[in-house]
């Protein structure tokens, strides 16, 4: 497989900012204490699945299948490896690289039905659109997200303007929803 056959137009990557990591740990522990009760400085990498984030961009949503075939050819995709308990199920072998959760796609209600639910878990509802793959890679989890360039553009604007400050602004929320629907047409 090469990057073009995988349907990838471009990509970005980042490592999690330490302050954002700390905020996320505090938030997660507050939201679900039982699940995150034992998280600490020596095991947080077993809980946090996006210490490293890679976002790939497609021109067309239909390109998802090419990327899915690419990623499942690069990493073992065995449901027996899917992590349920972050501490118990963590594979300590740093050389064992695999898909650690069932691949998911978040789509909006009304989106065309291009996803094959036998290959990827389909979650519908809300405005969020993205493919998600959690990969165990050399002792750490990394998250790979995939979306179209249009979906990324809308998401960046929404996250920059609406999300942090104006979630309750009816006009901005309506405008953001319109942009979301338009981005989904590509």
Regions found by a protein language model. Give the residues of each.
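Surface-exposed, low-hydrophobicity interaction/linker segments
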Residues: 1-37, 94-97
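Residue-level detector of functional hotspots within protein domains
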Residues: 7, 40-42, 117-119
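Surface-exposed peri-terminal alpha-helical interaction modules
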Residues: 32-33, 37, 41, 45, ...
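Long beta-strand-rich cores associated with HINT superfamily self-processing modules
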Residues: 45-47, 52-53, 57-186
């Amino acid at each position: 497989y090469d990057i073009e056959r995988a349907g990838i137009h471009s990509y970005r990557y980042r490592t999690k900012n330490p302050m954002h990591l700390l905020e996320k740990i505090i938030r997660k522990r507050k939201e679900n204490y039982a699940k995150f009760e034992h998280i600490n400085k020596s095991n947080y990498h077993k809980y946090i699945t996006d210490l490293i984030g890679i976002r790939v961009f497609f021109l067309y949503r239909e390109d998802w299948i090419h990327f899915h075939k690419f990623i499942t050819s690069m990493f073992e995709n065995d449901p027996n490896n899917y992590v349920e308990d972050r501490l118990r199920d963590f594979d300590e072998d740093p050389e064992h690289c695999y898909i650690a959760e069932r691949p998911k796609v978040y789509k909006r209600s009304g989106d065309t039905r291009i996803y094959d639910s036998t290959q990827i878990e389909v979650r519908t509802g809300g405005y969020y659109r993205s493919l998600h793959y959690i990969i165990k890679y050399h002792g750490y989890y990394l998250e790979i997200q995939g979306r179209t360039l249009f979906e990324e553009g809308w998401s960046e604007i929404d996250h920059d303007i609406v999300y942090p400050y104006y979630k309750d602004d009816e006009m901005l929320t309506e405008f953001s929803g319109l942009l979301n629907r338009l981005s989904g047409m590509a």
